[in-house]
Amino acid sequence: MDSRFLLALFLVLLVLGCEVQAAQQLQQDDPGSPALLGKVQESISSYWDTAKAAAQDLYQRTYLTSVDEKLRDMYSKSSAAMTTYAIIFTDQILTLLKGE
């Protein structure tokens, strides 16, 4: 695989991981310190904006049509496979519930 593709994939996963952590941290409200919560939210928002801008810049600099076509092809094949497996799984559950 191309190293640019792996780098872009790593950055996307890193950004998504940071977003999940930020969402979990924001759910844990501490009513005793609203000023601290505001500072944390502002800091996380700032980091998120910086990471998002860096990922977009990297994507624009390393954009390759062949990689884009491969990604679209992988997405279409994987979504078709998932649809097939979802139909099979649904059929198995219905058969199990009906008791045939």
From Swiss-Prot:
Chain intervals for the UniProt region annotation (Lipoprotein lipase cofactor): 78-100
InterPro entries, A to Z: Apo-CII (IPR008019), ApoC-II_dom_sf (IPR023121)
Keyword tRNA-binding: no
Predominant place of localization: secreted
Record keyword Secreted present: yes
Region (Lipid binding): 66-74
Keywords, in A-Z order: Chylomicron, HDL, LDL, Lipid degradation, Lipid metabolism, Lipid transport, Secreted, Signal, Transport, VLDL
Post-translational changes noted in the entry: Proapolipoprotein C-II is synthesized as a sialic acid containing glycoprotein which is subsequently desialylated prior to its proteolytic processing. Proapolipoprotein C-II, the major form found in plasma undergoes proteolytic cleavage of its N-terminal hexapeptide to generate the mature form apolipoprotein C-II, which occurs as the minor form in plasma.
GO CC annotation: chylomicron; high-density lipoprotein particle; low-density lipoprotein particle; very-low-density lipoprotein particle
GO molecular function, one term: phospholipase binding
Localization (cell): Secreted
Annotated signal peptide: 1-22
Pfam families: Apo-CII (PF05355)
GO terms of biological process kind: lipid catabolic process; lipid transport; positive regulation of phospholipid catabolic process
Biological role stated in the UniProt entry: Component of chylomicrons, very low-density lipoproteins (VLDL), low-density lipoproteins (LDL), and high-density lipoproteins (HDL) in plasma. Plays an important role in lipoprotein metabolism as an activator of lipoprotein lipase.
PANTHER family according to UniProt: APOLIPOPROTEIN C-II (PTHR16566:SF0)
Family listed: Belongs to the apolipoprotein C2 family.
Protein name stated in the entry: Apolipoprotein C-II
Organism listed in the record: Myodes glareolus
